[in-house]
């Protein structure tokens, strides 16, 4: 299965609780943390919600 390399580039400070929870759900809780996530529709939806806070690479 394909994976996505996701890096947090934005701070969750002054963001809505939903956006903070989404970052935690993705395994990102600190700036410049990188995770390899499976490319699923669920993960894509979460990334769309916090697109302004993360950088996605294939």
Curated annotation (Swiss-Prot):
GO terms for biological process: translation. Keywords: Ribonucleoprotein, Ribosomal protein. Gene3D superfamilies: Ribosomal protein L30, ferredoxin-like fold domain. CDD domains: Ribosomal_L30 (cd01658). InterPro entries: Ribo_uL30_ferredoxin-like_sf, Ribosomal_uL30_bac-type, Ribosomal_uL30_ferredoxin-like. GO terms for molecular function: structural constituent of ribosome. GO terms for cellular component: cytosolic large ribosomal subunit. Coiled coil: none annotated. SUPFAM superfamilies: Ribosomal protein L30p/L7e. It holds the Pfam family Ribosomal_L30. Signal peptide: none annotated. HAMAP family: Ribosomal_uL30_B. Belongs to the universal ribosomal protein uL30 family. Part of the 50S ribosomal subunit. This is Large ribosomal subunit protein uL30. It comes from Zymomonas mobilis subsp. mobilis (strain ATCC 31821 / ZM4 / CP4). The gene is rpmD.
């Amino acid at each position: 299965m394909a994976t996505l390399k996701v890096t947090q580039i934005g701070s969750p400070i002054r963001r809505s609780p939903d956006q903070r929870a989404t970052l935690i759900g993705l395994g990102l809780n600190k700036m410049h943390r990188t995770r390899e996530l499976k490319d699923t529709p669920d993960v894509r939806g979460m990334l769309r919600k916090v697109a302004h806070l993360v950088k996605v690479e294939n």
